[in-house]
């Protein structure tokens, strides 16, 4: 029997990050995939990033993950969403060449020491005394492991729907994992079903592009990862089509054959990526919906029509697509479909993403009730880090809602659970001024260095950057008066106040380039300059949050632990006890984020938790 420290099940976006980070930390790791040739495949849209999602990509990258570098290696269209708003809510997004993205992931996986790819279906978990000890493959092969990370995506009990058609599978043309799903249900883990969908693919040669408005790539040469020196591929434009009254009429006429409306699909789909049937049913008064036509590659004629995810019958899909201007002659190469799949209630997980009831078993990605490549990648990274840290005996630095979107997502999942596929949004983060996409390295790379998941190239880059930042901050500590700035051609109001140059950067008239008389002519990295200028601009707001943040971290340090006796806490009403027992918060801070928990209930919890801790010390 082959022996591993970590076994990762599934080669999607969660699986590759989990396996890669565990191997980077020095754990002997197996990545098990149905078909190794599909590792890193983009199952749905050929894009990475977006609002909230782009923050996750940058955070995974800051911990030396794969997704951002693969996105840059395959990007054929860059667009910064929300560019007109503050940087805290801007969303970097790239359109990727689907084949090149997968190739980039597979190249990094193949080059990673201590990472071994195994082809096959995981049919069962190996368990001893309630703890996971490895996996059994469908061909009879057994793999021993000290921890297992499940990253099954939509393959866990997956079933595909298109009109009246029904097929087993997690993705078109690929099998689903029914035996593993049955074992998890038999273990009495809390499970449910969710659904997602994908639009039809179109042959781009049959689109009349000249009649459609173009959406070009951004001119300024930003990249997803700071380790990418320049964009390696030529850029293409996307185009925008639009549904119309005729389109809506066709869709309504096909609803009686849609599995969403016949009752064949009972699971809830993603709120922020609804099917076109659902859009027309819910928003029938609108005169049209945008459809973004996104090329899937430089040497691939396939186009992804973003905005028309559907499980309507193929003939209805053809009529729907051809009803739109510019698409009258469009040829569908692969019809759209919906997929329904099993997921675990994420409230059954610790914040490490370890299953509470089965020590050594971790879950990441859509199995936890999320949707999206970026959410999956972030969970895979966190689960892999925690699994490797546990196996290798390392202390895991704490991530919390004030230092990462990843922690916001995991806290939301493990505390509140899901009733629909969870998507990251900037609005979910209370401390989003601290969690900008462009400062992810400053926030998280030191944590990665502490846990040992950062490679040599990023370590050298970060050390050089930290030294440059130190030099810049030293220069910006110099004081200056309004008169001195005016003499340098900077038109600030002459209020007589003497401020540090860092404080002066809060004023809109002052830029770092304008302060060259003080800081010299060192050519600082533009991304570092942008980050420092924004740190200065946001400083007053961040200072106001400091007291709140201290309270958060202090209450996070009051553990409640598994099996906390909420019913024994004096002063808690029956309603409070029921809410707490349902959510099973692991700290006082987590209890405070449960809907309906009152300040009085938290005060009672605090007193009881401290008494228990004191009694445990005495004992």
UniProtKB/Swiss-Prot annotation:
FAD binds at residues 10-15. It comes from the Bacteria. NAD(+) binds at residues 269-283. InterPro entries: FAD/NAD-bd_sf, GIDA_C_N, MnmG, MnmG-rel, MnmG-rel_CS, MnmG_C, MnmG_C_subdom, MnmG_C_subdom_sf. The keyword Protein biosynthesis does not apply. It is found in: Cytoplasm. GO terms for molecular function: flavin adenine dinucleotide binding. Its main location: cytoplasm. PROSITE patterns: GIDA_1 (PS01280). Its cofactor is FAD. One of its GO terms (cellular component) is cytosol. The keyword Glycoprotein does not apply. One of its GO terms (biological process) is tRNA wobble uridine modification. Keywords: Cytoplasm, FAD, Flavoprotein, NAD, tRNA processing. It holds the Pfam family GIDA_C_1st. Homodimer. Heterotetramer of two MnmE and two MnmG subunits. PANTHER family: GLUCOSE INHIBITED DIVISION PROTEIN A, PROTEIN MTO1 HOMOLOG, MITOCHONDRIAL. NAD-binding protein involved in the addition of a carboxymethylaminomethyl (cmnm) group at the wobble position (U34) of certain tRNAs, forming tRNA-cmnm(5)s(2)U34. Belongs to the MnmG family. This is tRNA uridine 5-carboxymethylaminomethyl modification enzyme MnmG. The lineage of its organism: Bacteria, Pseudomonadati, Pseudomonadota, Alphaproteobacteria, Sphingomonadales. The gene is mnmG.
